[in-house]
């Protein structure tokens, strides 16, 4: 069967830049799905996207579907013919329905019954006949939140469609897609080459458009932007901040990227750089430049969509546009400094945190008391912790945070520094929100750790206390994410404290506001312990490893983490699978019949294998017990791995359920001693293979 290259392009008005890449990928996926469902073989489907177009190149696609046979089932052979071998009325009715004669019949075996059938040859449809509907269906299935209809068109799309190209090699496939007749004419850059571009062959697409100042390949366009931005940054000994989402958006805004470096007045560098970066990235789509120390430099890079004969005009235009935005940030910053942070508590007293839990000032005072209590656990200075907690939410009333909400905490840090607060206090104001997401950094200061922990605990316990725990997909206070943050703060700072102790401390701040302390405590502890799985699955830890540790229900997150790490390491040992299986066998035996009280009686050990296992246990126990006491669980399990050989020998040569009651009891005690050594770390019997 012959193979062809197909080009499809949908030309539109400017597509939403934040959706362009998603639309391209979805169009590719839906088309691949359609081709597969139609039974059309192909080598690849390449996808392209630029501001005014979505396109696909289907390489080496079949010219048509393969011919097939369709089976139509008739009556059973026994019911199809009479005693003389003539067709019965049932068979005649089947043949009449299919429009066939006796000589066109076949039979097939349906279980134990042989049945009559008709095998109809079905000729495969051509690519030309199938492709238009495949593409239209793909377009209909794109993830478009709000579709629009343009002019008299009956079809809807994310933006008005202007032209459609559909080529099979050098031939146009006759089709109407999105109410537009397909052809072989595309269009170049809106300003540099607005005239029509006729495509002679599907393979000419990318090259023809580049001659018309359009880079249709998204990745190539993006790589060009990255190269240009790096070159411009290198020229001033700086590094560009290039967030992935901003890079995607800028790539989606230009057909012919030309990066240009501009400047702004150095006086604006006195403003928190986070505010300047935010306004330049979010509002202007600029790439900001920083030096080796991470300090913002008085430059920015804009990516133009035209190759200007006078680029200085574009540069000056962007400098003129950005200046008012930087001036606004400067104004907010200076205005805020007229009112000390501590004096903002009156405004916090008028801002509701949660209707039943009070205002933000109520929350601040609770956090302050909790932070003082937590200081003995975190090692923070109680006075610093209390002061930082009382100042923590004050910047929420500032004009800078009002304009740039993402600067909450960060703005407070700047204002606290200006007011002369020490590093622990000022840094804690920004660190209180860390970690913000999975894998995010943690606070560097002890005070920051304390406030971050206190803030999360106060919210979690309070929300549980008023009966508004997360349900299903509803989690308005992001308690699931917050709980993982609490676990990380405890574990990664090596805080030796139980979850229940922390919940109790948080409950003290609520007093009578929380009516049922016992239920709140139980629910909050269970919720936090339930987040272990999400935390460790993000790290790639297997579920059975977690189950092995959870079987012991450790109370301390730090202790839980040490056990998880130990079991994770244990799984890598060559003895692990055999020891897990042996532990499972031991657990099953002891579940059926518990070991009698008392120690193993050495005189009742008669078999060489049980004597050897007992001797090994006696030797390893005094080595392992100090390791367990020191919570060095990894070393403890590594030592216990040496028991594999004597355990295997024991089960190969010893009958545990002996007829002699004394021998049986002694062997059960021996297995219980073995089991207790392993379960002092985790229940390794639940490990899979």
Swiss-Prot record:
Q: Where's it mainly located?
A: cytoplasm
Q: Where in the cell is it found?
A: Cytoplasm
> Quick check: keyword Protein biosynthesis in the entry?
yes
EC number per UniProt? 6.1.1.14
Instruction: List cellular component terms (GO).
Output: cytosol
Recorded superkingdom: Bacteria
Q: Which Pfam families match?
A: DALR_1 (PF05746), tRNA_synt_2f (PF02092)
Task: List the catalytic activities from the record.
Answer: tRNA(Gly) + glycine + ATP = glycyl-tRNA(Gly) + AMP + diphosphate
- Cystine pairs annotated here are none
Assembly, per entry: Tetramer of two alpha and two beta subunits.
Family of this protein: Belongs to the class-II aminoacyl-tRNA synthetase family.
Record-given protein name: Glycine--tRNA ligase beta subunit
- Organism equals Acinetobacter baumannii (strain ACICU)
Question: What is the primary gene name for this protein?
Answer: glyS
